[in-house]
Amino acid sequence: MEQNGNPQLIETLMSRLCQPRTTKERFRLPFDEETAAKLLKCAIAGEVSRFGGTFLYPDAVDSQVRYLAASLTSGRRYGVMLCGLCGNGKTTVMRAFQNLLNVIRIPDNYHRTVYGMPIVNAVHIAHLCRNSYTEFLRLCDMEMLGIDDMGIEPVEVQEFGNMHRPLTDLLARRYENRGFSFITTNLVPQQIRKLYGDRIADRLNEMVDKIV
C-alpha cells in the first residue's frame, strides 16, 4: 500500500533512518598503558615457563610489548598483527594475550558474555574452508579470533567445485563484522599486498596495528 499521502508516517520513518545505528564498542583492555604492559610481560613469562623455558627480556621485546599495550588499551583498531621472522616469539605473545583474557574476564556487554579468543592456525582455517564450510563461517563471525602463521596456508582451496581464498574471505568478512583479530605472520606488509591483493592489504591497514 502506498503511503505517499501520509506525511506523519514519512516524518517518523525519516526520523528513525537519521538516528545513529547501534554498534558494538571496539575491544580495549580496561587498564592504562603501563599496567597493560606489565600484565602482558607477566603473561608472556608465564607462557614461556609453561614450556620449561626462561623468559629473557631484551630491549626489542620491551618495545614490542609497549607498542602492543598501547594498541590494546586504545581501542583505535579492530586488532593487531605481529610481523617478523620465524622464531621471534609471536605465537607466544598471542597465547599470552589469550591467557590474560581468560584470567581477567572482561565483560562483553554487547553479547552479554566475557571476552575470549580462540587461536586457529592459518593452515587449519584453509582446511575448514575446504572441508567444513559452516565451521569456517563460524570462525569468520567470532567476536575475537587469533590467526596464527598467516601466509603459510594455501591461497586457494576448492570446496564442492567452488574456489575459495580462505584468508582473503575470512579477513574480508571480519572487516565487515568489525571482529577483533590478533594475527601473527612471517610476512612483511609488501608480501601481504602481493599475496592477498590490494583490497585485503588496505583493509588490514584499517583493521589492525602492525607491530614488527
Where are these regions (language model features)?
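Conserved nucleotide-sensing/catalytic segment adjacent to the nucleotide-binding pocket
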Residues: 109-176
